[in-house]
């Protein structure tokens, strides 16, 4: 990067981290009050960026510091999030169901991978989900499951994240292809199983939430909390079922 390009890069990163407005105009106004947003906008939109290469260099830099260095004891979280927006012309913007709001919202839907361990947490990579005007994500060119598998391939084959375990919620755990993809790299996974899923137990199909009264649990202390746990491998698309409840609320996990 040239001197001016480096200055623009520092301006943009500083604005994203500390500015109240994340737009180019807002960043130029707050970080460089005497500067014009035209030069910064040109740097962002017209410079020939390789976003993947830049992100990989960011991750490499994080490994040079003990407090952010990843390890096999860490976890990779796969999830998605809807970022609410107002602009109608933003790339991939549309109406997506937001679980935190409990209703559809206008925004951009990102499927992302996140690294976390006992000392640090930071994003690894992301893919933007676009519905292509389809009401059902199954009709889209790429589903969220497809994007999640792409992320896993990138992290395992290009980045080389050593974390031994992937974590995801019941929605992603519902896709047996995603589970198989994780296992193909010799990695473990932990995911929630929906309580209405049918599993075979004692030669009979039962709902997961009906198992609790038929199993013997074992108490375990985790972070000063007492959980009643039980594990067993069941024939439900090769899921490994783990039922846990705390001693007060009996909440299944």
Predicted feature residues:
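Domain-level cores of phosphate- or acyl-group-handling catalytic modules
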Residues: 135-210
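Basic, short loop/linker segments at the boundary and entry of helix-turn-helix/winged-helix-like folds
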Residues: 1-10, 138
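Active-site-proximal, Lys/Arg-enriched surface segment
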Residues: 46-124, 130-132, 242-248
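Electropositive nucleic-acid engagement tracts
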Residues: 4-5, 16-88, 154, 185, ...
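An anionic, glycine-rich sequence signature occurring as long contiguous blocks
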Residues: 119-126, 133, 137, 188-253
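Non-membrane alpha-helical segments in proteins
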Residues: 11-13, 110
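Electropositive, glycine- and tryptophan-enriched low-complexity nucleic-acid-binding patches
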Residues: 38-42, 100-163, 252-253
């Amino acid at each position: 990067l040239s001197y001016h390009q480096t200055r623009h890069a520092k301006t943009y990163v500083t604005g994203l981290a500390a500015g109240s407005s994340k737009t180019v105009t807002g960043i130029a106004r707050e970080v460089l009050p005497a500067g014009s947003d035209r030069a910064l906008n040109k740097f962002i939109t017209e410079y020939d960026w390789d976003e993947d290469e830049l992100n990989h260099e960011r991750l490499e830099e994080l490994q040079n510091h003990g407090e952010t260095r990843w390890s096999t004891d860490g976890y990779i979280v796969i999830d998605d999030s809807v970022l609410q927006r107002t602009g109608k012309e933003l790339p991939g913007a549309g109406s997506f169901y937001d679980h935190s709001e409990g209703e559809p919202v206008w925004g951009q839907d990102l499927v992302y991978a996140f690294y976390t361990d006992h000392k640090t947490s930071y994003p690894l990579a992301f893919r933007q989900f676009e519905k292509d005007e389809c009401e059902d994500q199954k009709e889209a060119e790429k589903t969220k499951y497809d994007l999640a598998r792409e992320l896993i391939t990138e992290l395992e084959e290009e980045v080389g994240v050593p974390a031994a375990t992937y974590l995801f919620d019941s929605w992603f755990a519902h896709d047996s292809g995603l589970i198989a993809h994780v296992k193909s790299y010799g990695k473990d996974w932990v995911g929630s199983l929906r309580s209405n899923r049918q599993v075979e137990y004692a030669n009979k199909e039962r709902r997961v939430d009906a198992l609790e009264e038929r199993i013997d649990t074992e108490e375990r202390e985790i972070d000063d909390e007492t959980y009643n746990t039980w594990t067993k491998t069941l024939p439900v698309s090769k899921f490994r079922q783990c039922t846990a409840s705390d001693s007060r609320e009996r909440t299944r996990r």
